[in-house]
Curated annotation (Swiss-Prot):
Name of the gene this protein is made from: dtd
Protein name: D-aminoacyl-tRNA deacylase
tRNA-binding listed as a keyword: yes
Entry GO terms, CC: cytoplasm
Protein family: Belongs to the DTD family.
Main localisation: cytoplasm
Stretch forming the signal peptide: none
Origin species: Paracoccus denitrificans (strain Pd 1222)
Top-level taxonomy: Bacteria, Pseudomonadati, Pseudomonadota, Alphaproteobacteria, Rhodobacterales
Pfam family, one: Tyr_Deacylase
InterPro entries linked: Daa-tRNA_deacyls_DTD, DTD-like_sf
């Protein structure tokens, strides 16, 4: 699975003009299931995201996790994280997981974060969503579950 993680002061996702997920301080996580992801990819990625130390401590160093600060997580599915732009001008998405399994892994990721005690809001898989955020820092981190055993 791939994730683009943004430290936010606030974030919100809307579908057809209605807010379906909103958080205050915490993380906005755009997530994509990749073809061939193992069954435990969602849980492993969730554990890494929950412990990622990108919030400031008393010494103004990035040394605290979203769990440490009592923050929340907004999880939004985004298959375009699988974009292959190596050739041509139009990205390919063949490395993204098929929608049915992709949605299952996306939901497992959100549930795994909840199981770790985090408040989690979500977008709507496959919907045309509008995401607004205030990126705090800005801090934006790319994470791929395949990068770590």
């Amino acid at each position: 699975m791939r994730a683009l993680i943004q430290r936010v002061s606030r974030a919100e996702v809307t579908v057809e003009g209605s807010s379906i997920g909103r958080i205050g301080p915490g993380l906005l996580v755009l997530v994509c299931a990749m073809r061939g992801d193992p069954e435990d990819a969602a849980e492993k990625l969730a554990a890494r995201v929950a412990k990622l130390r990108i919030f400031r401590d008393e010494a103004d160093k990035m040394n605290r996790s979203v769990q440490d600060i009592g923050g929340a997580v907004l999880v939004v599915s985004q298959f375009t994280l699988a974009a292959d732009t190596r050739t041509g001008n139009r990205p390919g998405f063949s490395s993204a997981e098929a929608p049915e399994r992709g949605e299952a892994l996306y939901l497992r990721f959100a549930e795994a974060l909840r199981a770790l005690g985090l408040p989690v809001e979500t977008g709507a898989f496959g919907a045309d969503m509008k995401v607004s955020l205030v990126n705090d820092g800005p801090v934006t981190i790319w994470m791929d579950s395949a990068d770590r055993a």
